[in-house]
Regions:
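C-terminal SET catalytic tail plus cysteine-rich post-SET Zn-binding segment of SAM-dependent SET-domain
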Residues: 2-15, 116-205
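Catalytic cores of histone-lysine modification enzymes
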Residues: 8-121
Length: 205
């Protein structure tokens, strides 16, 4: 399984850092540098879901798989109305609060795919996130999380093709999960606080 893009990019990054380079290129180079700090993970193509994040070693339950802390982590946050106005596909942003969605920024966690039987879960902090293993993760296994653990948006329902034995077929809000699954995720502390607070998404406009 071949890794994607993070290898042998030093020359390209140096050119991109040139002040004559357009700002988007410099920003992209900065994003690639962020990817390299996750030494036990890599990006690769999945069979049906585009690029995913894969484990370069084994992880035990409770292990930290990745951490992404940055004072600016939540800078690129939009409301639902702003997402729609900018025609951003709803399957890409991560909901981080009531009517607050963090758009992709070039970090490795942008490529985490959904699974109804996830290998990992996300814990949110004021300056970023921690991804923890929920079960043993094999080397070269895809690192996934359950999107419903960070979803409280009545306008968003995604068709699921995760391939898990217990695939739900639809990815909906946290409160659509079976009760035992909700309780498990709460016990593991891998849900967004806002999914329990009844946050409101403004879809008018």
């Amino acid at each position: 399984m071949a890794a994607v893009s993070v290898v042998n990019v030093e020359r390209s990054l140096a050119r991109a850092d040139d002040r004559a380079s357009p700002t988007p290129i410099r920003d992209f180079a900065h994003g690639l540098r962020k990817l390299r700090k996750f030494q036990y993970l890599y990006l690769a193509e999945t069979a049906e879901r585009g690029i995913g994040v894969f484990a370069a070693r084994e992880f035990a339950p409770g292990d930290i798989v990745m951490m992404d802390f940055d004072a600016n982590y939540y800078d690129q946050v939009l409301s639902y109305k702003e997402l729609c106005a900018q025609k951003i596909d709803l399957k890409y942003p991560l909901q981080v609060g009531p009517d607050r969605f963090r758009v992709p920024s070039g970090s490795l966690d942008d490529f985490l795919n959904h699974s109804c039987d996830p290998a990992a879960g996300i814990r949110m902090y004021p300056h970023g996130i921690v991804v923890v293993a929920l079960r043993p993760i094999r080397m070269h296994e895809e690192v996934t999380f359950d999107y419903s653990t960070y979803l409280n948006n009545p306008y968003e329902h995604l068709i699921c093709r995760c391939g898990a034995k217990e695939c739900r077929g639809i990815v909906g809000n946290f409160d659509t999960l079976p009760k035992d699954r909700q309780e498990r995720y709460m016990a593991l502390r891998v849900i967004g606080d806002f999914v329990l607070e009844g946050g409101v998404v403004d879809g008018a406009g």
